[in-house]
């Protein structure tokens, strides 16, 4: 966010979900435990409340064991946007080349969020494409003024990339494999694309 943001004192981690299941007599493991962090940051000189929801890696059973192990070793939780209705910010796509089986995830650990990519050819050695303090990925989203997490990632197929490039004076042909869509809600989406052994940002029309 472009506004100056500073971290205030109060931050609390509250375990959710498991307590509700236990209260009804169900095993605590019946639902994945969702962590909720609440606190305050300074926005434009005023204390502003925020809430961040995160999920553990076992909320994503499709993750390969090697990927989950790396995320767990780094103490990662997966932050969820304030729009989330199901587990998000873990994707499976062909990011290295056409037909490859690759993964990407947002990792929240020690107050920092990192965008990590795991190629199928090297699942235990992820690449980090971007990092940011978690409190710099917050924005208001309802009349209460409480801030929520706004960073999301998605698979972008060649067709979706080509559609996003509509309106360019010299519109490129669709790329040869998936890109990684990197978005902040209500902001511009950027597209990471791996080609010739390096990551690049795909050109998009002015927004």
Range-by-range predicted roles:
Residues 99-101, 110-113, 124:
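Primarily extracytoplasmic ectodomains and periplasmic/lumenal surface modules that are beta-strand-rich
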Residues 1-9:
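Bacterial N-terminal signal peptides that target proteins for export
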């Amino acid at each position: 966010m472009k506004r100056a943001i500073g971290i205030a004192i109060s931050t609390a981690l509250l375990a959710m979900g498991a307590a509700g299941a236990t209260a009804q007599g169900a095993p605590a493991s019946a639902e994945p435990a969702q962590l909720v962090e609440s606190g305050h940051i300074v926005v434009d000189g005023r204390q502003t409340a925020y809430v961040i929801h995160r999920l553990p890696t076992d909320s994503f059973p499709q993750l390969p064991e090697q990927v989950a192990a790396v995320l767990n070793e780094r103490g990662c939780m997966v932050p969820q946007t304030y729009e989330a209705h199901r587990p998000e910010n873990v994707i499976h796509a062909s990011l290295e080349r056409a037909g490859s089986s690759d993964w990407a995830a947002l990792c929240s650990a020690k107050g920092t969020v990192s965008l990590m990519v795991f190629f199928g050819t090297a699942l235990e050695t992820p690449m980090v494409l971007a990092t940011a303090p978690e409190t710099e990925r917050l924005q208001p989203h309802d009349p209460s003024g409480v801030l929520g997490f706004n960073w999301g990632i998605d698979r972008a197929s060649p067709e979706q990339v080509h559609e996003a490039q509509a309106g360019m004076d010299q519109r490129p042909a669709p790329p040869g494999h998936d890109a990684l869509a990197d978005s902040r809600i209500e902001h511009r989406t950027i597209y990471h694309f791996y080609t010739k052994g390096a990551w690049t940002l795909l050109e998009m029309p002015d927004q």
